[in-house]
């Protein structure tokens, strides 16, 4: 099929590669403008832009698609490029810009979105992280016919993906990205064959995956250990769970932790023990064992290495 692709990060790049491998005609790709990245804050193209240029595809990078918005010239130019591309359908994956009504109406077969959850659960910006944080054991990707709502369009196809007990957001991201690429190729094949029925999203079971906030990554030891361990996994690698350890001026990042089936009489935040097997912290319910940490400005270290250079004073931990 002749299509336009809109996406920005690695999740979307995987889908673009799958569409190209399936032989779809993609004359135009939309992606976010280049952003500063790295230590030197050098302007860096998105993964999708890099893949598109490598494939010889024209790239558009409007700052907005709203003709009546802050960047009307950008939107008008993108509109002209889309009309010139004349796609049958538009595929959207983690693009990062709101698609106004004119965009949704332009392709004859509309706009299909690859969403990283089993809708209507986890509509919104951070479905991967919120699924882990909530303790879900299963998630997936939904191919959705886009409308003007927030992930409210009709569902066309689902691929289910299990969430392992130790999966981090990075690991689940990669699994869902691969599933998304497979799902959109399957959906377009069904669409071409006239066999892609749409189902309205049910009214029950709607949840929203709020955007990640760096402040939420600070672990509060008054909360249950099981929740804290899930948050460590959910916020790995971004924004990274943090905790203030006594004796250190800056909070440390916690890359791995586990909830122990144990109780503690000490106040939440108390260091119960520290050794090569882990740093055990009293919480509001249960014990959290820290397994991999990183000091500010340092490297990630397994706990047996970390504890050699840190001795816990006898007072509770504090959240960031």
Swiss-Prot record:
It is an enzyme of class 2 (transferase). Transmembrane segments: none annotated. SUPFAM superfamilies: FMT C-terminal domain-like, Formyltransferase. One of its GO terms (molecular function) is methionyl-tRNA formyltransferase activity. It catalyses: L-methionyl-tRNA(fMet) + (6R)-10-formyltetrahydrofolate = N-formyl-L-methionyl-tRNA(fMet) + (6S)-5,6,7,8-tetrahydrofolate + H(+). The keyword Protein biosynthesis applies. It holds the Pfam family Formyl_trans_C. Its EC number is 2.1.2.9. PROSITE patterns: GART. Coiled coil: none annotated. GO terms for cellular component: cytosol. InterPro entries: Fmt, Formyl_trans_C, Formyl_trans_C_sf, Formyl_transf_N, Formyl_transf_N_sf, Formyl_transferase-like_C_sf, GART_AS, Met-tRNA-FMT_C. (6S)-5,6,7,8-tetrahydrofolate binds at residues 117-120. Keywords: Protein biosynthesis, Transferase. It comes from the Bacteria. HAMAP family: Formyl_trans. Belongs to the Fmt family. Attaches a formyl group to the free amino group of methionyl-tRNA(fMet). The formyl group appears to play a dual role in the initiator identity of N-formylmethionyl-tRNA by promoting its recognition by IF2 and preventing the misappropriation of this tRNA by the elongation apparatus. This is Methionyl-tRNA formyltransferase. It comes from Bordetella petrii (strain ATCC BAA-461 / DSM 12804 / CCUG 43448).
């Amino acid at each position: 099929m002749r299509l336009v692709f809109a996406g920005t990060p690695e999740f979307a790049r995987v889908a673009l590669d799958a569409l190209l491998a399936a032989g779809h005609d993609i004359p135009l790709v939309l992606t976010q403008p280049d952003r500063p990245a790295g230590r030197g804050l050098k302007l860096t193209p998105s993964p999708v832009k890099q893949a598109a240029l490598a494939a010889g595809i024209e790239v558009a990078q409007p700052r907005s698609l709203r003709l009546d918005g802050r960047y009307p010239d950008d939107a008008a130019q993108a509109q002209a490029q889309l009309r010139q591309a004349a796609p049958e359908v538009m595929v959207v994956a983690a693009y990062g810009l709101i698609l106004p009504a004119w965009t949704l109406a332009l392709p004859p077969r509309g706009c299909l979105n690859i969403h990283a959850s089993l809708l209507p659960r986890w509509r919104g910006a951070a479905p991967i992280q919120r699924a882990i944080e909530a303790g879900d054991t299963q998630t997936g990707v939904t191919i959705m016919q886009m409308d003007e709502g927030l992930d409210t369009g009709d569902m066309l196809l689902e691929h289910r993906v299990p969430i392992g007990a130790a999966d981090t957001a990075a690991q689940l991201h990669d699994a869902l990205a691969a599933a998304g690429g497979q799902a959109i190729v399957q959906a377009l094949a069904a669409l071409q064959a006239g066999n892609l029925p749409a189902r309205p999203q049910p009214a029950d079971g709607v949840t929203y995956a709020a955007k990640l906030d760096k402040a939420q990554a600070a672990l509060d030891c008054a909360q249950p250990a099981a929740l804290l361990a899930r948050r460590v996994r959910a916020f790995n690698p971004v924004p990274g769970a943090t905790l203030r350890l006594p004796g250190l001026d800056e909070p440390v990042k916690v890359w791995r932790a586990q909830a122990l089936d144990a109780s503690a009489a000490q106040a939440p935040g108390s260091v119960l023990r520290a050794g090569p097997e882990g740093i055990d912290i009293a919480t509001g319910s249960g014990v959290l064992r820290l397994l991999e940490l990183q000091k500010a400005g340092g490297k990630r270290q397994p706990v047996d290495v970390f504890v050699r250079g840190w001795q816990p004073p006898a007072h509770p931990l504090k959240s960031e």
